[in-house]
Amino acid sequence: MCIRDSFRNKQAIIAELFAQYESRVDAFLRRPEGRALTVADKTFYLEALLAAMWHYRFLHRDLEHLLETDVQLAERYRAFAARCMQAAAEIYRGFAAADILAMNDQQIEALVLNSWIILTSWVRFLCTVRSNPGDLSEELMRRGVYQILALEGGYVTDSARPAVQALLQRLHVPMSAVVK
């Protein structure tokens, strides 16, 4: 049975897929209770973001169009975006409290906004700089996650720098592989 047979129209399919995406992100984008954050948590968040970006890449590719054509989805998305940015700020505060990042509230706010912009526009960016826009891969998505981690570079504490550097190395994809 085709997925379209279970839904009234394309908007209903998109709404269901967005609900799945929203649920997936809400499940992992939260600060753990009762313990300090670690660099391993940073790895977890970045890998979870990568998996979500890859699995739901089509949502990000056509996001503006999808939101322009569906008022209810646009309202849900705005609430989701606000929740995500609030959760991300709390997570960054946790990394600062754990002496992994040295940041104040203004820096956290700027990093949250810049990270959100990268995450939500990365697929669209890839489609504009590649000769074959449909030629997306998980490796290319990993570079988007790398970009977020790179933004944090100036805030990484000396004690966390070796572990964060190792993570950067693991996530790095050469720009020559991104822009084709």
Task: For the regions a language model picked out, list residue spans one by one.
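Hydrophobic alpha-helical connector segments
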Residues: 16, 30-59, 75
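Secondary-structure edge/capping motif, primarily at the C-terminal ends of alpha-helices
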Residues: 29-32, 60-67, 95, 99, ...
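C-terminal peripheral helix-coil segments that are non-catalytic and often amphipathic
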Residues: 124, 128-180
